[in-house]
Amino acid sequence: MIKRRKTREITLGTLKIGGNNPIVVQSMTSTKTHDIEATISQIDRLIKAGCEAIRVAVPAKEDAEALKEIVKYSEVPIIADIHFVPYMAFLSMEAGAHGIRINPGNINKKEIVRDIVLEAKKRNICVRLGVNSGSLEKHLLEKYGYPSAEALAESALNWSEFFESLGFYNFKVSIKGSDVIQNALANEIFAEKTDTPLHIGITEAGMGTQGIVKSSVGLGILLYKGIGDTIRVSLTDEPEKEVEVAYEILKSLGLKKKGIDIVSCPTCGRIEVNLPNVVKQVQEALKDKDLSIKVAIMGCAVNAIGEASHADVGLACMKGGALLFKNGKILKKVTEENMVSELLETIEKYYQEV
């Protein structure tokens, strides 16, 4: 079992982060925030996918003004993403945002950062303090020669100390880079020196297989070491996909349970059925079910039940049908035409029993 890093508890709206609380899955809308209808529609889809906190871009006044309606509507906390125009932070807080994300490295004056922090403190609004290689302070670049892991961690520690010197502790830190190893090292250095909660992710991970693999490895390294209080999988894809992948990463490490865990074999020359099609049918039928159960779908009967003994229910396929099993014991043989429906019925019964 993974022992998570002990961090202080902070509050984002009604959501508790850090401490002994579960890891929070976040994502970000890809709509123009001032398009309230489109933004709310995407928020609905994200919530349905299991997203627990949602960030929206606020580059202009019309976006900040739209937050009033969006915050009122959303069932989960809304975080305003602020870059380069610090005035938007004040407008977003006034509009009711539960949290704001700022990157002090792209705010010209420390006094402005101070004013934002003091306003957040007054309103009890959570702040995400962002540090990345593209906005590292000049003196740190001169000291280290490039945006090294040490430079990123030092920047985050310096700004954290500044926030705390103002008596403000309701913040988390994100240290992000597109390089997996640098990203991991920077977060590890920071985590060793403070109890501030960490938001983790790999920025600019990419799309498709590349993005998923990069995020899975980068997040997996940190999560295995107990680091991470909130996470986002950044993909060039629909935001709902980010949430899906985030849950799969957490489930694979035993850090979160959501939905059914379907395992299937990679197939070989012994296969007698269209296994990918069977798996897709089962996934589609169960995608909206909030059940905590492991299902195995194996391509043949050779060692299938033994290999999948850890599963609660499953199929060991063979020519013309499959063996349906539960808790490692064969229940019956089913035909190829009925094996998916029989499996789904068994899953439903299993869930009622537990």
Swiss-Prot record:
Its cofactor is [4Fe-4S] cluster. Its EC number is 1.17.7.3. SUPFAM superfamilies: FMN-linked oxidoreductases, Nitrite and sulphite reductase 4Fe-4S domain-like. Binds 1 [4Fe-4S] cluster. This is 4-hydroxy-3-methylbut-2-en-1-yl diphosphate synthase (flavodoxin). It is an enzyme of class 1 (oxidoreductase). [4Fe-4S] cluster binds at residues 265, 268, 300, 307. It holds the Pfam family GcpE. Coiled coil: none annotated. It comes from Hydrogenobaculum sp. (strain Y04AAS1).
